[in-house]
């Protein structure tokens, strides 16, 4: 195990989530060129990524710290703090402990596991628990975790994908001589190794388990075997599969499909005996194997050329081979021993149940023709006909080729006639054989006739029929100019090779040896169908339907796909979106061929799968390439990163990112924009900056373009400050930044409402005599006006000649309330002959409304009516708000009529909603009824916003019945009320004493799954129940809502009330709930709980809460401090009281005089005068006077006990005691 776990993973995913739940720590340097540190993997899912926080005020772009916490010097309190919002009820008790016992760690682990099962706890918290686990291991020599704690910890680590940490835990256990006996944990760890494509570690861990006598689960066997088959690890797959069959001797614990894959893999590697052993064991267990497994073993024997054992196997298992298997065997026999012996073997197969078809005889025909035995080939053809089969075109082609090869071309017409009689269409391959054969026989007239016939069938173009002989030569594969048919004019015909019908002596003017070699080669290749070459040709031509059809035919003809054909076919299939899934199925069907693909093809497959979004398959091939050390192209890395940003988890993305960095990956500049966009959306801003640095350095001639693209992407996605920091750094290094970059920064910063930064960039541009673009100016000018920088806005507007700039100025001045300037600007605009926009009237209308200039409002409104300019919704909202507050609601209603003329129904609802809202705000709810009647008359249906306004408005107007009625109507329509509406109705019901209806309402919300985490509503219901004395009902209600996840953010008031009434259990439960919800309770909550515990003399629990309270930064009240001090004194634990007072002083608090006196009196009772005197000194330093009786009593105790203690040299106890300036004599 130690050897296994010490193996460093080849590509370890780094751990990103070392972040506290309350604070984030950042620490990476700007433009750091170091690659991200690898650490343990974490499962973060295809969740929506939350971009990391970055500060823009510094040149240092900061990221989360990826370093693990150094446990040296870490206190238990620090470590427990990270878990205080997960299991506060447990961590609270351990805060005051100097260390942890094994039982404590187990309790903490059990509590954490329980919370983890409820969900909502991520990797960060598991890492925090792991750090406590590690801290406990080293707190003192000899500490040993309990086995159950180790199991729980390992299980949680595996669940979060923290594999490295699990390995460390197991190594630690083995050092202590312990062994984990939970098979499930090891199986889960093997599963993680498989997920990370680390089959080596998975197999080693499996072997270790078996040596320890542990039996993996069925699912573990299955996933491990499937992975080993995928990576073609035959020996390991067989060994584990055999162990599975022998160990799990029950069929319901085995997956026959997985075992079948192993058998196929064994047969592919010619390990047929091992495959047969597996099959026998399955049969011995009573398993009825399907024919596919027997087929695989049979083909394995065939590949091994062990035909005797093949027959023996078939006879033993009584397997009847199908035509695919039988034809495969027959094809191999023909190639190895010839067609005659193959036929004899076929007859033996027939006796064992094999049923041949026309292709079976076609294989025999082809090989007979290849061997030159045309007679037997024709006999086989006759046998096909006699059995009622229809001969295949390849069989006829074989016979035609055989006849031509033997010089029997005169008999070919009989074959052609038979083909026609059987209704077989002559194909291009048949015509090509005929042309080639006639060219071989020097029957060129016949060859011309065939070419003309091909034209009749539409197989060649008309232009090629003009010279049919040249076309015939082209079909054979000759260059027509290199082969000429010439007449021998010599009277002796010395050159004549043959004669035409007219008796002319003719000869071929060409290289006769090459001619004969070519025609013979074509005829030889036509004897047996060469499916591999046909598939390659169809794939390269893009005819994938034909290629796939040939692939199916190939299997029937018993031929195997070659590596080259597979590679070409896969590339073509991947390039076609319609056939992409076919390529995936072929990869799974032929794992051995997939394993043998070359690096270039694998790179191509990854790129195409990524383009089509098949990230899982691209990831599988990528890991295979890494394991086989294939070179990975830059384009492949780019495709993977882009695809994983969209489809895979953050860890998968970072894994590829790390590998790309190690390979010095550099994307093409054209891909950078898309990459930066994807990475930023995934939250990897640090990686974006790193990539930009590399691109910027690597493309010196395109640095301006790279900077522009980088800044554009970051500003669009909301990271303008990061982009600005990068640009400032580049400027500091002497780089020249284009003006367009500044424009992108300005737009981004304005969009992010960081106006001051945008103004700073504007100043920089103006200093450099640069003028912002029109788009930048339109965003800057209104903001400058609102920021009281109208002068700069005017100066900027003068630089741009556009009517849009005038609108921007008017808008900015209007929104800033500078209406006189806006009017002057409008006059200038009109005097320059520029037409005004409808928007200008709307913004001025809004400006006059804000300034309460009603005369101007009416003037602009009249102008808008005359010009038929529709008032915008925003303008109407400003107007109706002012009118309803005046109150002049009739004016608002009148304007609404004008506005509705240009609005669709949804717009009408918005307008009515605004009118209802502001009428309620103006306490004019009677007019609301009229508005509702009007809406009903016009057929305008109220939406969710309307109902919410009505519910809250009527409630605020004390019309509770109407409020409840509209709430009920809203719920009945399936609309979810907002918190404000629910709060208003619940409060009114509770105030009127009808808490039952409030509870019923809450149950309705709960039944619909509406999570309304309103603390006010819950508090109101609970407080009402408590005031009515119905404490059990209040507790049941709170327990139910917290259990169902409907937590309110704050329960402080309820906690205080329950604690005061002595219901501490539910009060503590609510306090814990708040902490789990990452909401820190108020000091009053802790004070009330502590005081309640003190009333029941539960001092230890009270101190637990007190310690937690202080560590959370809360200040206990004086009464809480005092109560603890008094209770500890009463319990004869005065040293604890003393410690509390000192702690209080250390925190800057002032203990009361009564607290000091209580502690001093207790020390006096215990005759501990030294401590008493120390308390008196502290009391005096806090400004309190010690009375004479206390002093004298202490002196008397000192004298009677003869306790003498020298303090400072030459100073007695009495003088030291009475030297405080706070002492006064009684008069």
UniProtKB/Swiss-Prot annotation:
Pfam families per UniProt: PPR, PPR_2
Organelle targeting peptide span: 1-31
Coarse class of the protein's main subcellular location: mitochondrion
Entry keyword annotation includes Transit peptide: yes
UniProt repeat feature PPR, residue ranges: 146-180, 182-216, 217-251, 255-289, 290-320, 322-356, 357-391, 392-426, 427-461, 527-561, 562-597, 598-632, 633-667, 668-698, 703-737, 738-772, 773-800, 802-836, 837-871, 872-906, 908-942, 943-977, 978-1012, 1014-1044, 1047-1081, 1082-1116, 1117-1151, 1152-1186
A single Gene Ontology CC term: mitochondrion
InterPro entries cross-referenced by the UniProt entry: Pentatricopeptide_rpt (IPR002885), PPR_P_subfamily (IPR050872), TPR-like_helical_dom_sf (IPR011990)
Gene3D superfamilies referenced in this protein's UniProt entry, alphabetically: Tetratricopeptide repeat domain
Location within or outside the cell: Mitochondrion
Disulfide bonds, paired cysteine numbers: none
Keyword field contains Repeat: yes
UniProt keyword annotations, A-Z: Mitochondrion, Repeat, Transit peptide
NCBIfam families documented for this protein: PPR
Family matches, as PANTHER family: MITOCHONDRIAL GROUP I INTRON SPLICING FACTOR CCM1, MITOCHONDRIAL GROUP I INTRON SPLICING FACTOR DMR1
Family assignment from sequence similarity: Belongs to the PPR family. P subfamily.
Protein name from the UniProt record: Pentatricopeptide repeat-containing protein At5g15280, mitochondrial
């Amino acid at each position: 195990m130690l050897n296994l776990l010490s193996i460093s993973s080849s590509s370890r995913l780094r751990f990103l989530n070392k972040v506290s739940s309350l604070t984030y720590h950042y620490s990476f340097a700007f433009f750091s060129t170091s690659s991200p540190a690898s650490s343990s993997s974490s499962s973060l899912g295809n969740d929506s990524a939350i971009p990391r926080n970055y500060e823009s005020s510094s040149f240092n772009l900061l990221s989360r710290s990826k370093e693990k916490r150094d446990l040296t010097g870490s206190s238990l309190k620090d470590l427990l703090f990270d878990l205080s919002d997960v299991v506060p009820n447990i961590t609270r008790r351990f805060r005051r402990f100097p260390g942890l016992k094994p039982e404590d760690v187990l309790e903490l682990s059990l509590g954490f596991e329980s919370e983890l099962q409820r969900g909502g706890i991520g990797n960060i918290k598991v890492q925090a628990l792991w750090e406590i686990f590690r801290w406990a291991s080293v707190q003192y020599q000899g500490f040993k975790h309990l086995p159950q704690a180790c199991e729980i910890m390992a299980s949680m680590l595996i669940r979060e994908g923290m594999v490295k940490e699990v390995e460390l835990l197991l190594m630690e256990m083995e050092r202590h001589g312990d062994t984990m006996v939970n098979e499930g944990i090891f199986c889960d760890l093997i599963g993680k190794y498989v997920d990370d494509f680390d089959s080596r570690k998975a197999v080693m861990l499996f072997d270790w388990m078996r040596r320890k006598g542990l039996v993996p689960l069925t699912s573990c066997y299955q996933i491990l075997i499937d992975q080993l088959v995928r990576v073609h690890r035959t020996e390991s797959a067989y060994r584990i599969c055999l162990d599975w069959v022998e160990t799990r001797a029950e069929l319901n614990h085995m997956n026959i499909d997985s075992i079948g894959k192993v058998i196929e893999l064994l047969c592919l590697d010619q390990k047929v005996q091992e495959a047969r052993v597996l099959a026998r064991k399955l049969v011995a267990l009573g398993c009825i194997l399907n024919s596919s497994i027997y087929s695989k073993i049979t083909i394995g024997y065939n590949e091994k050329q062990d035909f005797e054992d093949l027959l023996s196997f078939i006879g033993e298992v009584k397997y009847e081979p199908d035509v695919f298997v039988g034809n495969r065997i027959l094809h191999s026999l023909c190639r190895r021993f010839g067609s005659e012996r193959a036929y004899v073997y076929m007859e033996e197969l027939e006796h064992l149940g094999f049923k041949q078809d026309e292709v079976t005889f076609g294989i025999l025909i082809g090989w007979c023709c290849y061997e030159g035995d045309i007679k037997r080939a024709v006999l086989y053809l006759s046998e096909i006909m006699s059995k009622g089969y229809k001969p295949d075109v390849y069989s006829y082609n074989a016979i035609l080729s055989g006849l031509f090869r033997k010089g029997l071309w005169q008999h070919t017409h009989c074959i052609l006639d038979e083909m026609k009689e059987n209704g077989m269409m002559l194909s291009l391959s048949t015509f090509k054989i005929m042309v080639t054969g006639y060219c071989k026989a020097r029957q060129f007239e016949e060859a011309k006739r065939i070419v003309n016939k091909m034209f009749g069938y539409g197989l060649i173009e008309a232009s090629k029929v003009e010279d049919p002989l040249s076309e015939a030569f082209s079909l054979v594969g000759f260059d027509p100019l290199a082969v000429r048919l010439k007449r021998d004019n010599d009277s002796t015909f010395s050159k004549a090779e043959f004669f035409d019908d007219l008796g002319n002596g003719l000869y071929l003017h060409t290289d006769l040896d090459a001619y004969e070699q070519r025609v013979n080669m074509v005829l030889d290749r036509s004897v047996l169908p060469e499916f591999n070459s046909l598939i390659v040709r169809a794939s390269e031509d893009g005819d994938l339907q034909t290629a796939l059809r040939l692939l199916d035919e190939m299997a029937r003809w018993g031929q195997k796909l070659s590596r080259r054909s597979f590679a070409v076919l896969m590339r073509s299939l991947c390039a076609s979106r319609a056939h992409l899934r076919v390529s995936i199925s072929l990869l799974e069907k032929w794992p051995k061929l997939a394993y043998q693909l070359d690096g270039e093809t694998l790179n191509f497959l990854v790129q195409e799968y990524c383009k089509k979004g098949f990230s899982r398959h691209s990831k599988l091939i990528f890991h295979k390439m890494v394991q086989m050390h294939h070179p990975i192209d830059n384009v492949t890395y780019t495709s993977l990163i882009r695809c994983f940003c969209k489809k895979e988890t953050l860890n998968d993305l970072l894994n590829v990112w790390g590998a790309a960095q190690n390979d010095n990956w550099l994307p093409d500049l054209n891909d950078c924009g898309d990459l930066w966009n994807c990475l930023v959306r995934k939250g990897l801003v640090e990686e974006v900056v790193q990539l930009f640095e590399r691109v910027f350095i690597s493309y010196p001639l395109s640095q301006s373009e790279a900077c522009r693209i980088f800044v554009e992407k970051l500003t669009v996605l909301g990271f303008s400050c990061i982009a600005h920091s990068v640009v400032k750094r580049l400027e500091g290094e002497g780089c020249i930044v284009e003006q367009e970059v500044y424009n992108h920064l300005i737009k981004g910063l304005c969009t992010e409402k960081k106006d001051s930064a945008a103004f700073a960039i504007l100043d920089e541009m103006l200093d450099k005599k640069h003028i912002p673009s029109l788009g930048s100016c339109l965003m800057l000018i209104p903001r400058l006006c609102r920021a009281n920088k109208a002068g700069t806005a005017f100066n900027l507007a003068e630089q741009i000649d556009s009517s849009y700039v005038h609108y921007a100025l008017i808008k900015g001045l209007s929104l800033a309330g500078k209406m006189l300037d806006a009017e002057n600007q409008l006059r200038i605009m009109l005097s320059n002959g520029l037409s005004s926009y409808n928007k200008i009237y709307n913004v001025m209308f809004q400006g006059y409304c804000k300034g309460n200039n009603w005369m101007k409002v009416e003037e602009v409104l009249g102008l808008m009516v005359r010009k038929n300019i529709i008032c915008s919704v925003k303008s109407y909202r400003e107007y109706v708000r002012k009118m309803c507050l005046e109150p002049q609601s009739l004016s608002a209603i009148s304007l609404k009529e004008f506005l509705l003329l240009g609005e669709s129904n949804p717009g009408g609802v918005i307008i009515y909603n605004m009118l209802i809202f502001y009428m309620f705000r103006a306490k004019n709810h009677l007019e609301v009824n009229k508005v509702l009647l009007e809406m009903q008359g016009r057929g305008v249906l109220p939406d969710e916003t309307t109902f919410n306004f009505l519910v809250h408005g009527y409630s605020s107007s004390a019309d509770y019945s109407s409020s409840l009625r509209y709430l009920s109507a809203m719920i009945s329509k399936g609309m979810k009320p907002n918190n404000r509406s629910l709060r208003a109705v619940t409060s009114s019901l509770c105030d009127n004493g009808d808490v039952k209806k409030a509870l019923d309402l809450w149950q309705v919300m709960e039944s619909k799954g509406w999570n309304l985490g309103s603390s006010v509503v819950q508090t109101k219901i609970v407080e009402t129940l408590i005031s009515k004395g119905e404490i059990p009902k209040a507790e049941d209600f709170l327990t139910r809502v917290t259990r169902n996840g409907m937590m309110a953010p704050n329960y402080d008031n309820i906690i205080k009330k329950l604690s005061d009434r002595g219901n501490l259990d539910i009060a503590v439960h609510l306090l814990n709930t708040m902490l789990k919800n990452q909401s820190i309770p108020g000091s009053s909550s802790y004070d009330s709980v502590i005081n309640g515990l003190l009333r029941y003399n539960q001092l230890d629990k009270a101190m637990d809460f007190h310690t937690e309270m202080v560590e959370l930064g809360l200040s206990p009240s004086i009464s809480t401090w005092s109560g603890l001090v008094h209770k500890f004194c009463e319990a004869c634990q005065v040293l604890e009281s003393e410690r509390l007072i000192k702690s209080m002083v250390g925190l800057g608090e002032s203990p009361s005089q009564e607290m000091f006196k209580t502690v001093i009196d207790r020390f006096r009772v215990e005759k501990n005068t030294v401590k008493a005197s120390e308390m008196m000194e502290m009391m005096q330093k806090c400004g309190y006077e010690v009375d004479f009786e206390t002093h004298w009593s202490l002196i008397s105790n000192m004298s009677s006990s003869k306790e003498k203690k020298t303090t400072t040299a030459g100073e007695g106890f009495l003088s030291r005691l009475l030297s405080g300036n706070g002492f006064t004599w009684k008069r």
